[in-house]
Amino acid sequence: PYFSVWSSADRLTDDATRHWTGEPNPLTGLVRIDGKTYRIMGPEPKDVPALEQVSVEVRPTRTIYRFQNEAAAVELTFLGLAVPYNLDMLSSPVTYVAWKVESRDGKPHEASVFLGATGHLAVHSPDQAVVWGREELGALKAIKIGSQAQPILERRGDGTRIDWGSLYLASGQPRTVFAAAPAKTLAETFAKDGGLPAQDDAAMPRKVEDGAPALALATALGTVQPGTPAATFAMIAYDDEYAIDYMDEWLVGYWKHRLDEQGKGKAQPFTALLLKHHLRKDVYDSYCDGFDKRLVEVLTDLGGKEYAEIGALAHRQ
């Protein structure tokens, strides 16, 4: 429940994504088409123009944004595995972020995408210091950021943001690079040439309010041919390590219990869960799509189209 990122704007580029308390939890989305960079998520960098958003669709397990200009169309999808009768999926701390780019003018176009997340997502307040690092398992590569202090389960009450565990960006897709640096540096580097800094910033620990240390990944989609959309996906996830203080006993989340259980009682790294989700993305996507259709059909039968829209909006809340 601590991993909370919402867009409160009609257009995804109008405002920073936020925690449910209203505090910024900034994610940045950029797309580069034929050497020109556009924003598709977040208001920064301000000197990078926003790609026109033409629609947003909220389904029970996913939100789909669509953008376009004269040359290309971009579809950005956030998929959370919120299927109530499958506890392995429902408890998953992983959200998929997927992109699809297609030509609109019958010409080929070079395209690449960028996803960034600041240290705000891993602290209660920006005066806390964070550290970062990398992990990998097989084809899966990941970069993470978390508070230096790691005050596990110490905070209580409303308006509380998680400041223990680690936020991850992960991908097993080809032509994907990662970096950790100030948010402005990451976005400006991608906007300039479609890449990321060659080395992670080594100035850590650092307070989040000191230049907004952040993570980013960038994927080169190559040449998008007319009639053949290019697609890729990444994962944003949170490893909270411990989820509940139950009568002075720290308990892990259900997903972690199941992960260790599948490892025959041996503690498994978080990258094992990320690798599983990378490999099973198509399976989960199809499962969630079927659930979405069934739930919307039931809600429509019960109360009509608007009732179904409200139900889809409320489902992940």
Q: Which role fits each region the language model picked out?
A:
Residues 44-49, 76-82, 199-203:
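Short Pro/Gly-enriched beta-strand edge/turn motifs at strand-loop
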Residues 68-89:
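Low-complexity, acidic Ser/Thr/Pro/Gly-rich terminal tails and inter-domain linkers that flank the onset
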Residues 82-89, 100-317:
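Acidic/polar, glycine-enriched structural segments that form the non-catalytic walls/loops
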Residues 3-70, 157-188, 192:
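An extended acidic
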Residues 60-62, 94, 212-216:
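Short beta-strand-initiation
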Residues 91-97:
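Short, solvent-exposed loop/turn segments enriched in Ser/Thr/Gly
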